[in-house]
Amino acid sequence: MPHHRLDFNVNANSFGVLLFFLTLTICFISGCAPKEEGPDNVAKVIGSMTDSLPIISLPEDADPEAPDWKGVDLDPKSPVKPSYPAEEAKQFLLPEGYHIDYVLTEPQIEQPGAISFDGNGRMYVLELRTYMLTADSDGTLEPVSRISRWEDKNNDGVYETGTTFLDSLIFPRFVLPYGKDCILTMESDADNVYKYTDTDGDGVADKKEFFTNKYGRSGNVEHQQAFMYWGMDNWLYSTVNAFRVKETPGGVIREKTGYNRAQWGITHDDDGKLWFQGGASGVPSYFQFPIHYGTFKVENQFAEGFEVPWGAPVKIADMQGGMDEVRQPDGSLNRVTGSAGNDIYRGDRLPRELYGQLFYGEPVARIVRQIKPVVSEGLTTLHNVYQEDKSEFLRSTDPLFRPVDMVTAPDGTLYVADMYHGIIQEGQWAQKGTYLRTKIEQYQLDKVIGLGRIWRITHEGNERDKTQPRMFDESPADLVRHLEHPNGWWRDKAQQLIVLSQDRSVVPELEKMVRESKNLLARFHALWSLEGLGALDKVLVGQLLKDQNPRMRIQAIRVSESLYKDGDKQLAKNYSLLMKDTNTDVAMQAMLTANLLKIPSLRDDVTKLMTSNSAKGIQVLGEQILNPVEIRGWMVDKGPELTASQQEAMERGSIIFNELCVQCHGLDGTGTPLGNGTVMAPPLTGSPRVQSHPEYVIKTLLHGLEGPLDGKTYPGSIMVGMGDQSDGWIADIASYIRLNLTNEASIISPEQVSEVRLKSKAKIGPYQYHELLASVPQNIAPSDRWKVTASHTAPTRIGGTDSPSSAFNFEGWTTGETQKKGMWFQIEFPEARTISEIHFNSPPKRRGNYRDRIPPFQSYPRSYDLQVSLDGANWNTIKTGKSDSADTILSFEPNKTKFLRIVLTDDIEEEGEIPWSMRQMKIFGLLQNEKLLN
C-alpha cells in the first residue's frame, strides 16, 4: 500500500494551532488514515452484490440423500463480503510470537498468482487478472493479465513503487527473473518461452526475445505447465513437463526428467533437491529424490493424518466435493483437495526451527501448512508440525483468504501471496447443477474479484533484514561473497547472477571457497557456480568425492555428471566405489548417478549393494533400477506411437548417431565440449531448427552446412554432406535426431528424403545457414494482422475464447456442431505471400465421463478442398483431400496468395455429433519480411 506525505501550512496564530491539534486528536481517536489512492476495489466488489438474498434450490438431478448433498444448507445467506487488508489481518491465526503484515495490496495489484525477486530485491508479481471472474470462467483467456514489478524505496517494509513490467498477457504461466531488468515467461495455450528485457530503465519491458519452444501443454489453465524455476544445478525446471532446460553458450538445451505430477509450485532445499507441489492431490507431489534421475515410487511418504487439514471455521462449506468433504459444524474442509505454492524456508529472520521446513498453501482449506521432513534409511516422510494440536501454521477465518504462493524473501522472512478471491476452482468443475456452483451462488462468491494481497510473516525478537540487495550494481567478485550469506535467497540469487555473467575471472576465488570455506553451504554454491561457468576442475571434483562431509560427497557426485557427459568415463569407477560408502545417502546418490549415466557395471554394482546394505532407501531404489516399472506421467504428452518398422528405423538411427555424430555433437547431443564454455558443434537437444520443417534436417544431411549458425561460429565449422548415403540411411538418422535428444518432431520416411533429394539435386557443396533457411519452408508466426474467420465457431473448453484464431495455439478452434458440406475456415494475410504447407492437429474428443468407456470421436475434417485467392472473390482449389488421422499435413507447390481457405466438401456420414476441430496450426512458406516462428 502506498504511503502518503501530508503537506500542510498552518498559520502561527492560536486558532490555527488549536484547529490543527484538534483535527489531529480527532483523527487519532477515530482511527482515520490518509485516503487510499486509486479505486477502492473492496467497495466496488461489495457494491456489485445484490441486497436481496439469492433463493437457492436443490438442482434437479441432485439426490438429497447422496453423500455430496446430504445435510446441505440451502437457506438464503448474506454474501461473503471482502475485508480491507487491515481487517483481514485480524482474522489470521498464527502460533504465539508470530505476526503478519501486508506489504502490497489492491488496487496496486490484482489477483496475484506468484511472486519472485530479482537481484536488487525488486518483487515481480504474476497478476492473473482473468482468473475465475465468473463461475463459468468467462474471459479467462483475454489478454489483460500482467507482470508488475515493485520496490520498497524508503525501506519501510512496504512496496510503494511499482511499474507494469509486462502487460496484455494471456494468463501467464510464471515469472522468472533472469538477470538485470530481465524475466522469462510464457502465456497459456502457447508453446514458446520468451525473454523480456527493459533496455532503457523505465521499468517496462521493451525487448522480446525467443528463449525456447515446445514448452507448452494443452488443457485448461489449471492443467498447463507452470513455475519455471532455477535449480541449484543451474537447470530450469517446471511443473507438468518431464524435462529440464538450460541456456548454454551454444543455445538452450534440454534433458528428460522424471514425471513430477505437479501443478503450481517448485522449491528446493539446501542440498539442491527440488520439491514439487501437487494441485488437486492437495499434497506435495515429488520430493524423494532429484527429479532428473527419473520417477521412483515410494510408499508411505506421509505421516498418518497428513491429508486432514485443520483450517479455522469458515462456515460456508464451499468445497467442490460436496458435503462429504465438510467438517461439521464449522463448515471447514475435512480432507485436502487442492494446494498451491511452496517454499523450503531458508531465511535467517524467523525462528531457527523453521529453517529447512516446507511450507505450502491449501487455498480451499484457507491454510498455510508447515511440514517437517523426517529422513530415515534414505527415505523421507512428511509430518504436519501441528497435527497433534489439530491445527496449522497459518489459518484464517476469512473465507476469501487464498494462499497461492510463498517465498523466502531477501529480508529473511516468509512472504505469502494471497489471491483473496471468491472462487478458487476452474469453471470446468463449477458448472450449473454442481454442489460448488450452488454454494457460489448462495454466497455470491463470483462477485469477489480484482483483489489480492502479499503478506510478510515475522516473529517477535527477529527484526527483518533491512539490507537492500544491490547485486546488479556489484561485480562477480562481490557476488561470490554472498555465497556465504545465512539467507538462502542471497546465496541462490548470487549463484544465478554469477552463472549468467559467464565471467570466469572469479574461478580462482570460487575454487578457493570450495576447498577452504568453513561454510558448507557456501562450498555447495561455489561448486555449482563453477559448473555453471563451465569451469569444473577434474582434480578438484575428485578430491570432493572423498570429502569428509557426506553431504559434500553427494554434491561432488552430482556435479561430476557434467564431467562424465563431457567424456570423463573414468568416473564410473568412482560411482561403483561410492556405492559402498558407509553413509546410506551417499551410496544412494551413487546409485542414482550410475543409473542415470548407465555405467557398464550398473547391474552388478546395484545387486551387490542391495545384498550388503539393507536400508529401505537402498532396497527401494535398487529394486526399481533392476526391474524398472513404467511410471505414467500426468498431463504429459507421450509423443508419437511408432510402428515396428519405425522403431527399427530408430534403432538404426541410434547406431549411426553413436558411431558418427557423437564426435562433434556429443553423446547427449549438447555438443562436444572444448573447454571455456565452447562446444565443437551446435547442440541438437531441444533444437528449434531440428524440430522445424523436415527439409531442414534432410537438406543438411544431404548437402552439408558451413559457416556461422544464428550468428555463432563453431570450431567444427562445417557439417559434411552425406548425399552418397541411401535415402533409408538419411531417413534413419534424421528421424532419430528429431524424435530423441529431447526433440519432439515427426518421423521422416525414405520417400521424403527421395523427394527432397530430387528437388535439391542442383545444389553443389554445403549450404550457408541463410541459404538453407531460404530454401526450406519456414513456420511463419501468426500475426495480429492476420484476419482469421470461420463459418462456424464455438469454445473448445469452458471459459474458452470462441475465436477461430485459437486454431494456432493449444486452445484450438471448433465448429461446435457436426461437420457439414460448405463449412469453412479462412485466413486473410495483410499482403500476398508464398506458402507451401499447412499442418494442424485435430484432437480426439472424449464423450461421457471417466467411468464410461465410450470411444472418443475423431474431429479431423473428413473431406475438404484447399482454396486460395488474391482478392477474396475469385478462388482456386489447389488441393483436395481426406484426413484419416489426428495430424493433417497439406503439402502443395508454393503458391502466392492473400486468402487461404479450407472448405468441407461432404456431410459427415458417421453417427453422433462430430464437429470439425483444429489446433496448433502451422503455416509454412518461403522467407519474407515477416517474423519466423522459432
Residue ranges and their predicted role:
Residues 156, 448, 678-747:
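Extracytoplasmic electron-transfer domains, predominantly the class I c-type cytochrome c fold
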Residues 34-478, 489, 499:
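Beta-propeller domains with acidic blade repeats across secreted/periplasmic ectodomains
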Residues 406, 417, 454, 653-669, ...:
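The canonical Cys-X-X-Cys-His
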Residues 805-934:
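Aromatic, loop-rich ligand-recognition surfaces of beta-strand-rich domains
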Residues 35, 386, 458-467, 532, ...:
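Post-cleavage N-terminal segment of exported redox proteins
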Residues 647-672, 690-703:
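Sequence/structural segment immediately N-terminal to covalent heme-attachment motifs in c-type
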Residues 465-469, 491-502, 521-535, 540-546, ...:
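Structural detector for internal amphipathic alpha-helices that build alpha-solenoid repeat scaffolds
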Residues 62-79, 634-648, 654, 714-784, ...:
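Flexible coil segments in periplasmic/lumen-exposed cytochrome c-class electron-transfer proteins
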